[in-house]
Structure formats: structure tokens, C-alpha cells
Amino acid sequence: FRVDAPVAAGAAAPKPPTELLDYGLFGTLHLSRPAGEASGTVLFFSDRDGWNERQDRLAGALAGEGAFVVGIDLPTYLRKLAGLSGKCSYPAGHVEEVAHWIERQEGFATYTYPLVVGDGMGATFAYALVAQAPAGTFAGLVTLGWDGTLRFAKEICAGDAGAMSAADNGAYRVVPVAHLPAAWTPKPFASGARVTGLLADVRVAFDATGALIHPLASPEARADLAATFARWRRNEDAEHVALPDDVADLPITDIPPTKGDAHRIAIIITGDGGWAGLDRGIAAALNADGVRVIGFSTLKFFWHKQTPDAAAQAIARVIAHYGKTYPDARFVLIGYSFGASLVPVVANRLPDAARERVDGGVLISPDDEAVFEIHVGDWFGSTHHAEAMPIGPEMQASKVPLVCVHGADESDSFCLKPQPAHVKVVALPGGHHYNGDYAALGDLIARNLPTRNRPAK
């Protein structure tokens, strides 16, 4: 993360126009649009008193730098969150869903991972939110001020980074995690921001990631926040790695192995959250075992409706590109959840030349059906779609060996149904997320990667 230097004051800006839109748990969303095409999405959480003119002006400054800003009234959401059933709360899922929905509503050409901003109590909430989410869910975090008095009615479910809430007199307070899953720009003393509660609470949270606390003397909060967003966009652009022309239009991430000569290449077809925590955890384990990983984001590829053949053609292009670069490499297709159900569908439709390079497929917690478009709202329960393709017949027809992995707690797993002889079924402790032990999941996959005899030359 970064602690930014102060920015000189600018002229006072008029209150920008804000569009209001109702959305379920979040009540009224406050939308601030850029003049042209958005360069990124910002999810902005208000302070404890709700969305007001201060946040309107800050959102307007962000929009002036090209951000599409979704303003969220924190008190409204916290009231509705407290009324939900369940032992613990998972706000990261709710917020990810609203990000997907609003970008689909706005007609974004592809999904862009949002930057999360919080003001005052919204800063403390935003920290807990990003700490809970799998790595890759949010592009980054900016906190203005801090409010150590934030309390949740229920425990916040632990995420991949561990617990971020602790019991406190019948409620739950935010506690720091050792490693935040996204880049954090803390501005504890930004102009106009509140720091409430013991300063030690703030220091503990910031020290957890090695930050140094010092006051920022920026006299103009809007200019400072706008400049922070602009710097963040520049950093994102600078970190982007250009892909070769023949695969430049595909949503792939290339991760070389930490050892070995890339004689095995795994194409990971992600879950519907895109290149995130579980997929990255598997990639790390495979990398350590000498496997090159190509992550294929279903969130981006299936943002618009595709066909089974189009999906197979995209994977065939990946195989062709890396197969040319590494002529002795063998490939395996690995998918999780949404992506797992696509593995047999894609494998069965690959051109012969591509399929001959594929040793097999691994399905991690597959659904019974494969679908070919991201449907907003599917993140909170299985939904049948008319265009869905049952994968049972695809498994039966597979010309490559398959491994079906499920959590021992997934009593309704597709893997537990009768499977053909060429499908190996493997169980691991936990449910759909495998208790967050992605290293164990990755190690299991590495040990069970399918193999085939090389075709005769």
C-alpha cells in the first residue's frame, strides 16, 4: 500500500449532480458519472451519519478523474445486514454482487475490479470488507480517517486473510489482519475526515501492514482524493503486462513456474469471481511443483454471452500459443465451480491438434450444468438457466481422463453422482471453499494431475 504526500489545494468545486438508484440491501445508491468513458469503478462507503454533501463532493472529484462512483449509505446497509440470518455475515459477497450488477447495468464492455473507498466509519467498514474478500476481488482500498467505534451485530465471517472481527460486549469490532488481500492507501488524517475512538486502535490496524502514521496536511480533500485515484490508475496501467498479439484479446494471466522447464502447463478456468483467491492459491501450489499456470478469467470472458464452441476456440488459441513456445509441453485443464463445469464441454470441442496436447481435466466443485454467460445474482445460490448444458453427458463422452474434486461437506456435489470409469473422484476436508486451505487443494491437484501417453511421432 501507499501513504500519499499532500496535494495542493484547488478551487472549491460546486456540488456535482448525483443520480439515485435503489438496490436491495444497500438502499439508495448515489451514482456519480464521469464526463466520458469510465476508467474505473469506485465503491464509496459513507461515514456513520450516512451519505451527505461531503461524500457527494468527494465522489464528484473522483468522477472528474474518470471514475464511475457508486456511493453507499453505510447506516442503511448495516441495519439490513444485522437483520440477515446466519451465524456470521459476509458483506464481501454483497458488495461484490452490487459491483457486478452496476457494471452490467451500465453496459461496461468488460468487468473492471472496483477500488473501495471509505470515509470515517466507512473507512473501518471498508477495511473489514477488503480483508474478508478473496485476493483479487477488489482492486484496492483507500481509507479516509478511521472510526474505531464501529460495531457489527454479528461476527463477520473469516476470510482467506483470517478473522477481521472480534467479540466486544455483545457486538463485534474490527480487528486487523496480518496481510490485507489488496493494496491499501491509508489516509488517517485526511482533511475533513474523522478519527474516532482510541488512536491506538488505528495504529494497531496500520502497523499490522507496516504503515507509518503521520498527519496529512492537505487543505483540500477533494483534490487529494482525486489525485490519489489518478495515481492508482497510472500504477494499474504501468503494472499491466501486454500479451502477445495472438492472445492479446483473451482474459489470461501467465504465471511461470518457480522451478522446472514448463514441461507441464495448467490452464485454470476460474470460478465466476474471476482470477481470485482460490484460483491463485492453486496456481501457487502448481508453480511450486514446476507447472506453468495460465489463468483464464470466466468473469471477463463470459461477461457477454458466449457459445460452447467459442469457449473451446479460446482455450484452443491458448494451447496453440503456448504449445508453439513450449513444443514439448503437455496441458491440463483445471476449473473451479463455474469454470469446472466448462472443463469437459471445452475438452470435447477442442480441435484434434489441441486436444492431443491435453493430458486431462480437473473439475473442482463443478455445478451440474455449464452456462456460458455470467448472470448477475448467481453468486448467492444456484439458478437454472434455459441455455444451460448438463455436464453428465459431457463427462461420459470425454476423450481425456478427468478428476472430480469435491469438499467432504458438499453433500450434493456433482462428483458424488455415478461417474464413468475415466473419472477419478477425490475428496478434501471442507465445503465449496475447502476451509480456505488452497495450498492443500493445490497440492492434491498437483498429485492427481491426469497423464496420458504422448502421441506417437
Place the predicted regions along the sequence by residue:
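Alpha/beta-hydrolase active-site loop
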Residues: L84-A109, Y113-P114, A128, K305-Y326, ...
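Cap/lid segment of the alpha/beta-hydrolase catalytic domain
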Residues: D73-Y90, D272-G274, S297-Q313
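Short, surface-exposed "cap/lid" segments of acyl-processing enzymes
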Residues: P34-A67, G71-L74, V247-V291, G295-L299
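Catalytic histidine neighborhood in serine/cysteine hydrolases
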Residues: V3, V70-G71, V202-A223, R292-G295, ...
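N-terminal cap/lid segment of alpha/beta-hydrolase-fold proteins
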Residues: V3-E37, P215-D261
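Primarily recognizes the serine-hydrolase "nucleophile elbow" in alpha/beta-hydrolase
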Residues: E103-A171, H321, A329-E394
